[in-house]
Regions:
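Active-site segments that bind and position negatively charged phosphate/pyrophosphate groups
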Residues: 26-157
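A short N-terminal beta->alpha junction/helix N-cap motif
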Residues: 11, 32, 36-39, 175, ...
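Conserved phosphate-interacting/catalytic interface
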Residues: 20
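Gly/Ser-rich, acidic/histidine-flanked active-site/gating loops
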Residues: 17
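Conserved core segment of the aminotransferase class I/II
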Residues: 23
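Single conserved hydrophobic/aromatic residue that forms the stacking wall/gate
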Residues: 1-5, 9
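C-terminal charged capping/lid subdomain of soluble metabolic enzymes
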Residues: 135-219
Length: 219
């Protein structure tokens, strides 16, 4: 049925978003000096995006699906966490959403992850530079004549636009999650001390990120 086909499509989107976010949770963390783990992470992210597009274009493409399985193995087996602090704030906040609603994990990540990025990317120059590097190396942003901030924002914009084009939710309401003040307080209390590498996310930070999730990220 069309409903079943639609559900299968959504599950693919959410699975790929979880893969992509897993690599970012390790990549967007200290240290940000030269290291092989980050180079591998960028390659995995680029390939996840290729597999994602291919699988959505043709769900029966065996080559694309086999690539996606390899993508997911390398995204989730923690090989790219070697030498990295790791972050996992986005997952911590999303788990709070999943604790109180029936939202799919990947759908929650699609909402929270870009908003976490918007919350932390300007914390200091080296973090902004990391987001700019990601924008160039993963999303193909042209950096010539631009500040790191501008490049970083273009990268986050491309990520959000990609999620929009594949049909992922960009806000809590689009994901069917209550976003009234009492609900946001409840999610933030559950997320609590979410940790983090670039920025230590405490309960009130989580609440601010969740508040921002009422609207799509834009600069």
């Amino acid at each position: 049925s069309s409903s079943a086909a639609s559900d299968v499509y959504k599950r693919q989107v959410y699975g790929f978003e979880d893969m992509f976010c897993h690599t970012c949770e390790q990549y967007f963390s200290y240290p940000v000096d030269d290291n092989l783990s980050d180079e591998i992470a960028e390659g995995i992210q680029r390939h996840i995006l290729r597999s994602w597009r291919a699988c959505l274009s043709d769900p029966k493409d065996y080559e694309a699906r086999s690539n996606a399985m390899w993508d997911s193995t390398l995204a989730l087996n923690r090989i790219i966490s070697r030498g990295k602090e790791e972050d996992w704030v986005t997952h911590g906040i999303e788990h709070a959403l999943s604790a109180y609603t029936d939202i799919a994990h990947g759908a929650g990540l699609a909402v929270v992850h870009p908003h976490w990025m918007a919350y932390v990317y300007l914390v200091n120059d080296e973090v902004t530079a990391r987001f700019a590097r990601w924008a160039v190396d993963v999303w193909g942003v042209t950096p010539t004549g631009k500040t790191d901030r501008t490049v970083a924002e273009e990268g986050i914009d491309r990520y959000v636009d990609f999620l929009r084009r594949v049909g992922a939710p960009l806000t809590l309401s689009e994901a069917g999650v209550p976003d009234d003040p009492a609900s946001l307080d409840k999610y933030a209390d559950h997320a609590g001390e979410a940790g983090g590498s670039f920025v230590q996310i405490h309960r009130d930070d989580a609440r601010a990120i969740l508040e921002a999730c009422k609207e799509p990220v834009s600069f």
